A protein has these predicted regions:
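Bacterial N-terminal signal peptides that target proteins for export
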Residues: 4-18
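Membrane-embedded beta-strand positions in outer-membrane beta-barrel channels/transporters
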Residues: 132, 136-138, 182-184, 225, ...
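Outer-membrane beta-barrel "beta-signal"
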Residues: 323-336
Length: 336
């Protein structure tokens, strides 16, 4: 008799499935179609437990177990990645790619006058100043975000503009000494690597870089790349080897000698400071360049920024010229 009563009191697998589905439907997660990856992890876990039909697990135990999986799934992302996901479908939001900054005051050890020494430019090179304005604008646009090969991959168009403005050289009409344009298309996906608490990712893409000039001042090249990186909320490292496809100009065929075959990007947050570094190097020639920076709070949406560069390849016009520069200004978006 007791056995019969226990069987009556114990919910059947079908009853448990109904209870779990009702509980899931009543949760705030189901009320929003724009769920995060961690919320989807929770939903999938509950449905998986229903499919397994484990009669000994109570509703509370299953939800507790799935909450742990949800927390673990949340750890494999970053604040920046979550914010980008939230605004990906907003047509009024431009997603930053690389750093966006303005350095109104920069000083070089010695400005590169070599490209302007021909008779075409006369004595214009004499008017170039060691002080100039440097700024960078960089953004990316998602082209495909829906399950290309897996649930976490995306295809982007990226564009970066970096400019060097001789604003203080009034004697030669304050020209833009060089402006570099970097359009690219790249595929990005998360990697199933469990090492660390952050997110492993990979990028594969094609990039064209040019200064938009003609004749003697023209510089450009094309490359394909495949990089791998690791990111947490306070740390990021990304290495991007590339293969040079060549350029349309015959005057920078040796660009690899100075820019190398890869780029390494790192960032680290310490309290309110963020330290960044971007470098490239050619192990055969011994040439390379390093850009190091530190940002700090200044205004609500603007950070102060100090940047230092040493080496070759700060710009395309200077790819084979060794330069040192220090600059101060503002930073709109950082790396992490």
């Amino acid at each position: 008799m007791n056995t019969y009563i226990n069987r009556i009191n114990q919910p059947s697998p079908q009853s448990k499935a109904l209870l779990l589905l009702l509980s899931l439907a009543a949760s705030p997660v189901m009320a929003d179609d724009t769920r995060t990856d961690s919320e989807q992890t929770f939903d999938n876990c509950v449905l998986r437990q229903i499919h397994m039909d484990v009669e000994q697990d109570s509703l509370e135990k299953i939800k507790a177990q799935c909450e742990q999986e949800k927390t673990a799934g949340r750890a494999k992302t970053t604040t920046r990645h979550e914010l980008e996901k939230e605004t990906a479908e907003n047509p009024f939001v431009i997603t930053p790619y690389r750093q966006n900054y303005l350095l109104p005051i920069t000083h070089m050890k010695s400005v590169n006058k070599n490209p302007y020494n021909s008779e075409v430019f006369g004595d214009a090179a004499d008017g170039l100043s060691d002080e100039e304005i440097k700024f960078q604008i960089s953004f990316k646009v998602p082209l495909i975000t829906d399950d290309i090969f897996n649930e976490s991959d995306e295809l982007y168009f990226g564009f970066t503009l970096k400019s060097f403005w001789q604003a203080y050289s009034s004697d030669i009409s304050a020209p833009f000494r060089d402006t570099n344009y970097r359009p690219e298309v790249f595929y990005e996906t998360k990697l199933p690597i469990e090492a660390g608490d952050g997110l492993w990712f990979s990028r594969v893409g094609y990039e064209h870089e040019s200064n938009g000039r003609t004749d003697e001042l023209s510089r450009s090249w094309n490359r394909i790349y495949a990089g791998v990186g690791y990111e947490e909320d306070n740390f990021m490292m990304y290495v991007e080897p590339w293969y040079n496809l060549g350029g349309m100009d015959s005057d920078n065929t040796d660009i690899e000698d100075y820019l190398g075959h890869y780029e390494l990007t790192t960032a680290y947050k310490y309290d309110v400071l963020e330290f960044t570094g971007v470098g490239h190097y050619n192990f055969r020639t011994g040439y390379g360049g390093l850009e190091a920076g530190v940002s700090f709070p200044l205004l609500e949406h603007v950070r102060g920024y100090v940047q230092y560069f040493n080496g070759y390849g700060e710009s395309l016009i200077d790819f084979d010229y060794h330069n040192q520069r220090i600059g101060v200004g503002i930073l709109l978006t950082d790396i992490i």
